[in-house]
Design a protein with these regions (language model features):
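N-terminal beta-strand motif that seeds the catalytic metal site of vicinal oxygen chelate
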Residues: 1-17, 67-72, 120-124
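Exposed loop/turn and edge beta-strand positions of beta-sandwich/beta-sheet ligand-binding modules
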Residues: 4, 34, 66, 100
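Conserved active-site tyrosine of GNAT-family acetyltransferases
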Residues: 18-25, 84, 111
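Conserved acetyl-CoA-binding loop of GNAT-fold acetyltransferases
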Residues: 24-31, 88-90
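Vicinal oxygen chelate
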Residues: 39, 81-124
Length: 124
């Protein structure tokens, strides 16, 4: 009956700019736009809906209540890290290696927390 998450929505003061950021920096494709809302799709089919926000929001902190980060899976951590670095992305720390998994936190155009990850093996 329940098949999983179809998409996740992010409210942005500038939905178009944020959709374009995901396309330019993370290879998402802007595949649908209506009335100022944008759907962007990752290579694995994951979708984000970017909707207009009413006003600005202070950048989230790691331990605030609510959704804290979106994890972006990569198959070449070093290449992805270099790509983001060359694009001037704001990193929220240094790359880490935890239990064989390589990870790095960074921020999108609006300051939302993203998590780059290359797993040694898939989650169970």
């Amino acid at each position: 009956m329940f098949r999983g998450l179809e998409h996740t929505a992010i409210a942005s003061p500038d939905p178009r700019a944020l959709a374009e950021w995901y396309a330019a920096h993370l290879d998402f494709i802007i595949n649908y736009e209506y009335a100022g809302n944008y759907f962007v799709r990752a290579a694995n089919g994951t979708m984000l809906e970017i909707i207009p926000a009413k006003g600005a929001l202070a950048p989230p902190q790691f331990d605030d209540a609510g959704i804290r980060h979106l994890a972006i899976e990569v198959d070449d951590f070093d290449a992805a890290h270099e790509h983001l670095k060359a694009a001037g992305v704001r990193f929220l720390g240094e790359p880490m290696n935890k239990q064989g998994n390589r990870l790095l936190f960074f921020a999108d155009h609006d300051g939302n927390i993203l998590h780059l990850i290359q797993r040694e093996r898939p989650l169970p």
